[in-house]
Amino acid sequence: MNNPLVNQAAMVLPVFLLSACLGGGGSFDLDSVETVQDMHSKPKYEDEKSQPESQQDVSENSGAAYGFAVKLPRRNAHFNPKYKEKHKPLGSMDWKKLQRGEPNSFSERDELEKKRGSSELIESKWEDGQSRVVGYTNFTYVRSGYVYLNKNNIDIKNNIVLFGPDGYLYYKGKEPSKELPSEKITYKGTWDYVTDAMEKQRFEGLGSAAGGDKSGALSALEEGVLRNQAEASSGHTDFGMTSEFEVDFSDKTIKGTLYRNNRITQNNSENKQIKTTRYTIQATLHGNRFKGKALAADKGATNGSHPFISDSDSLEGGFYGPKGEELAGKFLSNDNKVAAVFGAKQKDKKDGENAAGPATETVIDAYRITGEEFKKEQIDSFGDVKKLLVDGVELSLLPSEGNKAAFQHEIEQNGVKATVCCSNLDYMSFGKLSKENKDDMFLQGVRTPVSDVAARTEANAKYRGTWYGYIANGTSWSGEASNQEGGNRAEFDVDFSTKKISGTLTAKDRTSPAFTITAMIKDNGFSGVAKTGENGFALDPQNTGNSHYTHIEATVSGGFYGKNAIEMGGSFSFPGNAPEGKQEKASVVFGAKRQQLVQ
């Protein structure tokens, strides 16, 4: 990375140049041009090396989403072999992403509503439905299960003969979690499944009504399942198809089980088990998402009594609700025979019980500062800082092929323009957004675990970075992020032993800080005060005769991001409190990386 001012100065005095850019995209290790004598007295810093988290899976259909739906298979059972389908398979590409909205609202369900006519729309319910766990039914953020019409489609003119449920298997959540518990928590709920449809396929253990031939066998139609309280023994709490998960948030693991609850009557001497385990779950947490395996519990059932004989390596899901109150996910068995969805929650709160729930820690930051109101608004995130969710629409923040070496870059997708910083940051991203003539700023990052921040004890950790700012008072000033000498600079000294942070934000081509920042560390974040100097900030410094000055004092907040608190960032906004026409306003986002001494 070459600075022309530095190059010119090199012609007249000895200097050292800016350090090499990390990854070809720039770094924050900016030092003023110095003489040889200064080099011996002033230390020089460079970005600490870091590695981005590996992408678990970049395939479109296994990427994070609000939810997924799969069409219930129905094969064309036409009497003419020319049109008859012998097999309607399931495949990984059959899962369709669901968009943001209420959990029980999505386009596939709307499609069924439009064509239902006088038919009943049948869908899974937890409160009094076919599957439920008593004490774990008050779901707010998640829905999972099925929605379908009992409506055959016999259209001889178009050579279509379809029998069985017409609908979808799905899960959907809202408000992806930004905080998660920090201890072991039990979640309970339900699960549902559908199989492929294959000519002459029957599963004796599911009953004749479940399907499998002309249509996929569906959990809602499985026979011999305990669904009614009247048929249960005293104190029984689990009905239908139930799920149970133990999530250890400290070591980021999930263990779970998917059950069938058996209907046992006096005349039923064949099945005396209260529960039958169908799958056990093993998964690992990644931010507010998880990925793992579903292990079939009865692989030896090769006689066709049931379809649950193959493991799945494609299990995925996430936590929903502000503090990880609920979870949901899906998988497809490796033999493509079974598609399954599940949803579960923490135990329902009783009246008068502590509503706060278990202790949590922040795992993700994602927000924007609106350009009109100068207010912080939370936005959704699935924990991938290379993607941004704007009003539920996913934007890739990756640079184009021609911009991969750029320190910051611009993108334009789905009517949104974004300027994204910075190429040397692996665990956070921040920048500017423009949509429908509205200009906002944004920041998102994957927080450092609280335990990692607590383990740091150094008294003088240095972080360097840059910032975007907009400041107004009669006239306005705006500043762009930069890694050039003389550009917008952010510098912080962090004392992890006393939990104190002091820093400055300096504007382009200026020597005095635009803002000084003092803050205190709490857990894996910080909060404090950002304020202009005693004389204020000159919005138009070239106008020496009648320059506009603004005085700002605002609450600043932010967090540490990545492994071992390698990065930090934050923001503040000031919506103004002066009479109309003289309002002082500001919005700022900043990011920085920890520095190391150049050896």
From Swiss-Prot:
Main location: membrane
Protein purpose: Neisseria acquires iron by extracting it from serum transferrin (TF) in its human host. Acts as a TF receptor and is required for TF utilization. Involved in the initial capture of TF. Helps select only those TF molecules that can be used as an iron source and concentrates them on the cell surface, maintaining the iron-loaded status of the TF C-terminal lobe until its delivery to TbpA.
Subunit description: Binds only human holo-transferrin (TF), via the TF C-terminus. Forms a large complex with TF and TbpA. Interacts via its C-terminal domain with Slam1.
Disulphide-bridged cysteine pairs: none
Organism from which the protein derives: Neisseria meningitidis serogroup B
GO cellular component: cell outer membrane; cell surface
A Pfam family of this chain: TbpB_A
Membrane topology: Lipid-anchor
Name this protein carries in UniProt: Transferrin-binding protein B
Lipid-conjugated positions (N-palmitoyl cysteine): C21
